[in-house]
C-alpha cells in the first residue's frame, strides 16, 4: 500500500469519506491516523480514505505511489468512488484545495473544506487548475469554512479565497472567528457538520 494512503474499511458500501491532508500531511493540526480514528468512532460503518501530498504541491504532482499529476489522480479517484451512493471529500488548507478540485472534476455529492486555497499564484503549477472558480460545477454541494481572523490578504487562509467562489448557488460559505479543527472535533461541532452533510439525499 502507498505511504500516501491510509484507509479504514466499514461494512456500509454506500458511503465513502475521503480526506486530503494539507500542510505537514495533517487536517488542521490533526495527524492522519488520529483523524481517521475520529471518523471511525463517529461513522464506524462507512469506508474512509486519507490521502497525503508528500510533494507538498497542492496535489499537482500527484499522490506519491499512485499518480504523477492531476489528470492521473482524477482517473484513479474515479475508480475509487465508483459504486458509492454518497461521497464526501474533506480537506483543510491545501487539502481543502484538493477536496474542491477533485470533488469538482468528479462531481461528488459533497465537499467540506476549511480555509481552502482557491487561487494559486505559483506559476509552476498547471494553469487551468490555479483558479478553482473555473473548475467548480453546479451539482456538487460545497461547504466552505473561512477564518475571519486572518487579516493579511496574501495569507493562504484569507477569506478572499472563499469570496472567490461563493457566488455559486451550490456553495455554502461559513465564516468563523478563528477555526481550529481540534476544537471543532472536541466540542462535537465537526461531527454535527459531517452528519448534516451526509444526511442530505443522495444523487438520483
Predicted regions and their residues:
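Short, surface-exposed "cap/lid" segments of acyl-processing enzymes
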Residues: 1-46, 55-57, 144
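Cap/lid segment of the alpha/beta-hydrolase catalytic domain
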Residues: 52-65
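Alpha/beta-hydrolase active-site loop
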Residues: 62-82
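Short, surface-exposed basic-aromatic patches at helix termini and helix-loop junctions that form
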Residues: 79, 102-109, 162-165
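Alpha/beta-hydrolase fold nucleophile elbow
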Residues: 83-93
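Glycine-rich nucleophile elbow surrounding the catalytic serine of serine-hydrolase chemistry
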Residues: 91-103
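A conserved short beta-strand
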Residues: 107-122
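The feature captures the conserved acid-bearing segment of alpha/beta-hydrolase catalytic domains
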Residues: 121-204
Amino acid at each position: 500500500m502507498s505511504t500516501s494512503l491510509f484507509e479504514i474499511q466499514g461494512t456500509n458500501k454506500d458511503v465513502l469519506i475521503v480526506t486530503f491532508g494539507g500542510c505537514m500531511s495533517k487536517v488542521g493540526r490533526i495527524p492522519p491516523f488520529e483523524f481517521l480514528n475520529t471518523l471511525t468512532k463517529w461513522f464506524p460503518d462507512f469506508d474512509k480514505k486519507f490521502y497525503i501530498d508528500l510533494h507538498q504541491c497542492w496535489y499537482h504532482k500527484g499522490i506519491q505511489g499512485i499518480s504523477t499529476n492531476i489528470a492521473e489522480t482524477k482517473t484513479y479517484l474515479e475508480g475509487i468512488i465508483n459504486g458509492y451512493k454518497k461521497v464526501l471529500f474533506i480537506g483543510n488548507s491545501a487539502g481543502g484545495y484538493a477536496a474542491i478540485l477533485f470533488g469538482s472534476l468528479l462531481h461528488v455529492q459533497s465537499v467540506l473544506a476549511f480555509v481552502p486555497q482557491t487561487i494559486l499564484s505559483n506559476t509552476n503549477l498547471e494553469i487551468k487548475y490555479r483558479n478553482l472558480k473555473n473548475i467548480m460545477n453546479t451539482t456538487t454541494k460545497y461547504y466552505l469554512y473561512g477564518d475571519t481572523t486572518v487579516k493579511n490578504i496574501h495569507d493562504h487562509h484569507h477569506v478572499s479565497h472563499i469570496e472567490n467562489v461563493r457566488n455559486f448557488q451550490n456553495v455554502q460559505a461559513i465564516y468563523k472567528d478563528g477555526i481550529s479543527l481540534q476544537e471543532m472535533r472536541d466540542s462535537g461541532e465537526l461531527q454535527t457538520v459531517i452528519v448534516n452533510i451526509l444526511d442530505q439525499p443522495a444523487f438520483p
